[in-house]
Amino acid sequence: MDPLRQPREEFVKVLGEVSRELGLPEVPEVERTRRYGFFSARFHKYKVDHSRLAEVVNLIKNKRFEFLSSLSVDGLYLNADLNVSKVAELVFEAVVKMGRKYGFTEECVTGSYLVEHTSANPVHPLHIGHGRNAILGDSLARLLKFCGNKVETHFYVDDCGVQVMYAAMGYNAVKDEVKKRIEKSKPDVVIGHVYSATNAVAEIGRLKKELEKAQDDERKREILREIDEWVAVLKRLMDSEGDIISKIAEELGRRDLLNEAVELNRRYESGDPEAKGVVREVVDLVLKGQRETLARLGVEIDKWDYESELTVWSSEAMRIVSELQKRWPQYIEIKGGAVVFRADKFVQDYNLWDVLDLPRFIPPVTLTRSDGTTLYVTRDVAYALWQARQGFDKVIRVISTEQTHEQAHVRIILYALGYVDEAKKIVHYAYEMVNLPGMKMSARRGQYISLDEILDEAAERSASLVKEKNPEVSGVIAERVGVGSVRYAFLTTSPRKPIEFKWDVVLNLRQNSGTFLQYTYVRAYSILEKAGEIGNVPVPENMLAEERELVLKIAEWPSVVKEAAKSLRPDYVAEYLDGLALVFNSYYEKAPVLKAEESVRGFRIAIVNAVKTVLEAGFYILGIPTLTKM
């Protein structure tokens, strides 16, 4: 139920009458700008004379309307204000009938969706950047589910490639030590250190070989600086995992790790049982830790898709390379044994920029290594094709803007292979990075802030903050406040804008934070607990300004949900909830509810109930935990 449906229909009738009088070929669209009225319509494109528009509106403005309170003309805008008392009746009726589903409308239902998100490499813990991905993907899924759509969430387990092989090789060298260590620590944390150390040892070995061949003194000094940097990485890792890191350096230091990793990857991709056992053991350990972190955030994954199973062992990735070579030999080049597809020329020749929503610059794409093994993008094409064939209307892939070209290549190659409908199903839901002031991150060097560390600090800071108001706050409440604050911080900004993560903003009790919203919810909940049953609600003709604003704000909720779902923008929900909470808290400070006069007490309790209902629905969409005390 949408409380604004009937008022909007009444305004559309007015627009129809005005348009007929003016002899217009169509009725202007209704806009909700609230600039000069709650509803507006622009007559600019029809070249209407302003005085004639005003004259026509004057003829009908004094009619009796059920939901419109006034009509006015400003330039070539026709504006309408609403009868807020009538709207309040519609709002309360919708809230009582729909409860926590208030906000859902039939227009909100748009189809079925496969949402792939997080998909972190299984070599280290989820870090703060993965946090934004996971929370965005989870909230998109929640938003689409709230709207009645069929939604399935997927995590792509990238278990192929040299980096995963480094983790497996390092783990194999110190397996006994790692097993003891993970009895007390999360497995993804320990494997993350093992991976970074193995990578550092491999880089030191590679650079030493390069140093032997270097002839230029400047290049030699540059290589020595790089070696020193990687040695520093090992020393830093020893502070947390001394015995394990020392053994990795000792066991692997004299081996050609890069070539060994390439060979192990080749064996793994060919399905060698021994290689599968080594790699899967370490991958599953990391996934166990990543699952724990996601559960802590309230993120649920429906299906875990292993890259090896869906794209490599099925031979699907190699089939794609072979088919592309047969179909489009004129766009294929062989460079050093590697297969390259000239995606740039293909897009230009077939003018595909608008068809596939592509960036203007498209580089060529390498499909295989010189040894014939497939690369990430090739396997990703195979995975995208598999996703597109799962019976969903759209496939939403939550992947950072850093992969804009790779994701464009996926759609281009699908199109080139004749999978046109499948290519058009794929949506690259791009998002920008999360910046921590003073912190430069590199997973290969073991330099990152894990998502668990962020959540730990959020809980700790939340406990200190909330205990100032309520000394009896438990650790469970502090954890839920921390989770809410982190989720909101990652959702309140447009996905296309980078986030500067600052604790004073994340835990602001006065505005624009998950903590602020949770505090507002607790306030509304507390009032309703004391109020008891909500009986008949007579709506007063005269309301406080904040009451009028709250009624109209609550009435807008279904429209906000519909627009957020249509645009795939959970930040619209976050922005709306912050605005609602600001108005409600201002109202709370000015107007007594429980001790109000009997003539308005029921009305005010109904407003509080409506605010609480909207917050509950919004919290579900954003994944913010609800609290009854704080």
Curated annotation (Swiss-Prot):
Entry GO MF terms: arginine-tRNA ligase activity; ATP binding
'HIGH' region (motif): residue ranges: 120-130
Highest classification ranks of the organism: Archaea, Thermoproteota, Thermoprotei, Thermoproteales, Thermoproteaceae
GO cellular component: cytoplasm
Principal localisation: cytoplasm
Transmembrane feature ranges: none
InterPro entries on file: Arg-tRNA-ligase, ArgRS_core, DALR_anticod-bd, Rossmann-like_a/b/a_fold, tRNAsynth_Ia_anticodon-bd
Family (UniProt): Belongs to the class-I aminoacyl-tRNA synthetase family.
Enzyme Commission designation: 6.1.1.19
Top EC group: ligase
Reactions this protein catalyses: tRNA(Arg) + L-arginine + ATP = L-arginyl-tRNA(Arg) + AMP + diphosphate
Designated gene of the protein: argS
The name this protein goes by in its record: Arginine--tRNA ligase
Pfam families found in the cross-reference section: DALR_1, tRNA-synt_1d
GO BP terms in the entry: arginyl-tRNA aminoacylation
Keywords linked to the UniProt accession: Aminoacyl-tRNA synthetase, ATP-binding, Cytoplasm, Ligase, Nucleotide-binding, Protein biosynthesis
Compartments (UniProt record): Cytoplasm
